[in-house]
């Protein structure tokens, strides 16, 4: 955490992020995923029950499927989720990310979705916090633009948000 995250300090201009509020069983799932990694690197295990919910609110609307990448395995779970969103998109996929550092499979998936008529938009920072990653991100622009991907840069400050939104039905 840093002061720029709450715009108390403006090292990169206005800091733009995204957040959601979750309640219910998904929160416990995320807690367990965090504690699994936390405990793997601690000499003494943290007691999970200290963080267990005492009550769960009634389900409102929608479905939340918790997932997380972990340094404890080789499974690229988040990438698999993102590739699935791109392959199933029919109308649009909007992606906000501060760092576009992708492999060939993801690059191909972005281009393929655009070529089959999906409105693929990337929203990236126009002001870098990490210059090397900023240059890497921009190195993908030309092949993506040629495939029909629309690329926007957030310039009032630094875009730190990380979101995939597709077809009014799924977000990550």
Listing of model-derived features with the role each one plays in the protein:
Residues 1-172:
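Charged, low-complexity intrinsically disordered terminal segments
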């Amino acid at each position: 955490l840093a002061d720029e995250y709450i715009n108390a300090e403006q090292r990169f201009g206005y800091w733009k992020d995204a957040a959601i509020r979750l309640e219910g069983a998904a929160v416990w799932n995320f807690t367990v995923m965090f504690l699994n990694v936390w405990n793997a690197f601690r000499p003494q295990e943290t007691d999970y029950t200290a963080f267990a919910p005492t009550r769960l609110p009634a389900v409102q609307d929608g479905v939340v499927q918790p997932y997380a990448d972990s340094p404890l395995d080789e499974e690229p779970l988040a990438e698999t989720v993102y590739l699935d969103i791109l392959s199933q998109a029919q109308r649009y996929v909007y992606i906000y990310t501060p760092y576009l550092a992708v492999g060939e499979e993801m690059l191909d998936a972005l281009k393929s979705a655009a070529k089959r008529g999906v409105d693929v938009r990337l929203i990236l920072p126009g002001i870098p916090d990490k210059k090397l990653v900023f240059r890497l991100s921009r190195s993908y622009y030309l092949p993506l633009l040629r495939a029909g991907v629309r690329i926007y840069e957030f310039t009032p400050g630094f875009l730190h948000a990380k979101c995939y939104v597709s077809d009014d039905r799924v977000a990550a």
